[in-house]
Every structure is written in structure tokens, then in C-alpha cells.
Amino acid sequence: MAIERTLSILKPDAVKNNITGSINSYIEKSGLKIIAQRKMLLTKKQAELFYEIHKDRPFFGELVEFMTSGSVIVQVLIGENAVSKYRQIMGATDPKQADKGTIRGDFANDISENRVHGSDSLENAHREIAFFFAECELV
């Protein structure tokens, strides 16, 4: 079993609807630990760079607009198989397909405002964590 780090973003809809504490409970109950956390307002440039992988997709502009529409909470999670474990507790990207008992299944209604982001691979987790945090902040 590998101890991994992964990035979590509690999106503007989660912050606005004051469900960040509930989401953190799901994270902690899964056995993952939050080792770094920061509340911030992403600039358009930051959102474009972070989601650059989606720049040619039709939803890119809407995604950037949404992610800059309010505060987000970026977190680094650590634990056994953190990337896959967090993806499991997030639930399917489309909340309509997400199981009950997952973050999206319990708290989200719309695919474009689905409450959370999580790294989709260990490689992307390293890149995404470095985007927001210096190594010395991860304690």
C-alpha cells in the first residue's frame, strides 16, 4: 500500500453553500488527512493555467469562469492510495451518476457545479500540488 498525496479543491459552490466542513468530514472519515489547506480566490490566469489540459474542450471557458466566481479551498490530502481513495469518495463527475454516500452524490446537483476537484493520477497530483503549495508547506 502506497502512501500518496493528492490535491483537493473545494469549488466556489461548496464554499458559497457552506458545506466545506461536511466535505472535510467525508475526507477524514475515509482515512485521508488534510496536511495543507488554503482559502483563495483564483485569478483568471491561474484558473486557465491550472485547467490548461482542458483548453480545447468546449466547457473550458465556463469552467474558468466558474472557478473564478468565488473563493475556493485548496487542500493537500495524504494517505494510503490517496488519489484513488479521494476519487472514490468524490463520486462520479456527473452528480446524477454519483452514488449516495459520496460527496457529489450527497451534495451536488449539476455537472458544472459539482463541489470538488481531485487529482486524477499520481503524476497530476504532483503537478497540481506544486501549482498551489511549496514543498516546505506540506507538513
UniProtKB/Swiss-Prot annotation:
The active site is at residue 117. GO terms for biological process: CTP biosynthetic process; GTP biosynthetic process; UTP biosynthetic process. It is an enzyme of class 2 (transferase). It comes from the Bacteria. It is found in: Cytoplasm. PROSITE patterns: NDPK (PS00469), NDPK_LIKE (PS51374). This is Nucleoside diphosphate kinase. The gene is ndk.
